[in-house]
């Protein structure tokens, strides 16, 4: 009876872990940022060959200052111009839809590096760092999906090996997603890339340039998924060990 209860909760936690990790992986809101430059209030969003443009109607009569917004995730880094009257970045994202978006692939190019002209050395470093980040994310997602399939196969046959393999994959997934989360925090808050980017923009764009940033829902899904990964992984390992003792 106890093993069935443990199996139920392990399966529930495993399903939640898979859900949160896939949401974190598939949504492009790891970072929310806004740039304000009063000397270029009406500058248009630039695009390059291959960019994806999403066009809607823009209100030309708005008197509020124009702000450039950014959001990024594993797949895309998007930019658009809009107005924000109350200064609440979270409220803006939940209550407003972007009017013009320019989305670029973000696999190897994290915010805030816009192009190679910014800094060649930093640009290459960003690509390498982002590469490790992307690989860790892919390993974490692959491990949690594989672990889920193995557990589904283990349940009908009561195979202790499959339970242990599934639990191990959940633990591996939790570890790599934890690494992904830590690397992202280090990139945004520990390294000086944000401050260097702000100084660069003040020197080359406008003296009163301001950058506001906050973590998005995709980022917040990751540690929740990590917690459930570790919890379900440990439970599946215990279940596998118990099943092994019962049949041997």
Swiss-Prot record:
It is found in: Cell membrane. Keywords: Cell membrane, Glycoprotein, Membrane, Myogenesis, Signal, Transmembrane, Transmembrane helix. It comes from Danio rerio. One of its GO terms (biological process) is muscle organ development. InterPro entries: PMP22/EMP/MP20/Claudin (IPR004031), TMEM182 (IPR026763). Residues 1-26 form the signal peptide. GO terms for cellular component: plasma membrane. This is Transmembrane protein 182. Residues 27-136, 189-218 are extracellular. Residues 158-167, 240-248 are cytoplasmic. Belongs to the TMEM182 family. It is a multi-pass membrane protein. Pfam families: Claudin_2 (PF13903). Coiled coil: none annotated. It comes from the Eukaryota. Glycans are attached at residues 66, 119, 212. The keyword Heme does not apply. May negatively regulate myogenesis and skeletal muscle regeneration. The chain crosses the membrane at residues 137-157, 168-188, 219-239.
